[in-house]
Amino acid sequence: MSQPIVVAALYKFVTLEDYVELRDPLLKAMTDNGVKGTLLLANEGINGTVSATREGIDALLAWLRNDPRLVDVDHKESYCDEQPFYRTKVKLKKEIVTLGVPGVDPNKAVGTYVDPKDWNALISDPEVLLIDTRNDYEVAIGTFKGAIDPKTETFREFPDYIKANFDPSKHKKVAMFCTGGIRCEKASSYMLGEGFEAVYHLKGGILKYFEEVAQEESLWDGDCFVFDNRVTVRHDLSEGEYDQCHACRHPIDVKDRESEHYSPGVSCPHCWDTLSEKTRRSAIDRQKQIELAKARNQPHPIGYNYKAEA
């Protein structure tokens, strides 16, 4: 029986003034250990999801933690039978998760971390405003019971949503969550800057909650979107049954795949009537290349349009 692939989502907000110089040695550490996936580097820290054998992930984590600034880098693990990534990349960015608000710095101020074991009690408090900081297509397939959906298409829209809908003088307690902890951590820094006083966020995100909270005690409803080819995971961290539309990135279920508007790699019921003819032709050509690569047992020549958590 083949060894399962370990998928590690990791991040840390920490000042990395030499992040440009870190790119090449980090990429070498990944390739030397057979690690695939994408890591983002910025002055504010590191973020991304990678996958490899147990030995490969352990070797990469050891390499990262050899740097005193990354010795406590946060990471969550899950497993799958096949490699969920096709390439190995290290990208340089202005932000490791893009909020687009100058001055927001989680290295200087963040909300209160809440461990998964204490999360249920917090969000069961009727005075706590519970906000899902993820994008609309993620929220659509699963969220915590009673959570507010901002209906944002990107994290950049989150600040405008907060300004339009909430008042620090009226909303005294705010709790936020996201997939792995990074977006809600940065959101908490933003909220404090806007004058909100009691700001909480789920430490380690939904994935750590799944890992540490028993399913029979869970307040989660649905699957959780992940940023790799598994698309979603269940509460037990096993791979879900969703696919993802390559055109619009929206998760698609069995009902979507049975729709007359679904064409593998080209369109789905969520986007079929919004695609230009040029985009449709490009998607058809891309799908042909992907199917040809699969038939030859080769990595996809173009790959899926997956991005690091954004």
Swiss-Prot record:
One Pfam family, short name: UPF0176_N
Active site (record annotation): C178
Keyword Oxidoreductase: yes
Domain Rhodanese: start-end pairs: 124-218
GO molecular function list: oxidoreductase activity, acting on paired donors, with incorporation or reduction of molecular oxygen
Keywords: Oxidoreductase, tRNA processing
Keyword DNA repair annotated: no
Biological process per Gene Ontology, one example term: tRNA modification
InterPro entries cross-referenced by the UniProt entry: Rhodanese-like_dom, Rhodanese-like_dom_sf, TrhO, TRHO_N
Signal peptide: none
Catalytic activity of the protein: uridine(34) in tRNA + AH2 + O2 = 5-hydroxyuridine(34) in tRNA + A + H2O
Enzyme Commission (EC) number: 1.14.-.-
Family, similarity comment: Belongs to the TrhO family.
Function recorded in the entry: Catalyzes oxygen-dependent 5-hydroxyuridine (ho5U) modification at position 34 in tRNAs.
NCBIfam families attached to this UniProt entry: PRK00142.1-4 (NF001136)
Name of the protein in its database record: tRNA uridine(34) hydroxylase
Organism phylogeny: Bacteria, Pseudomonadati, Pseudomonadota, Gammaproteobacteria, Pseudomonadales
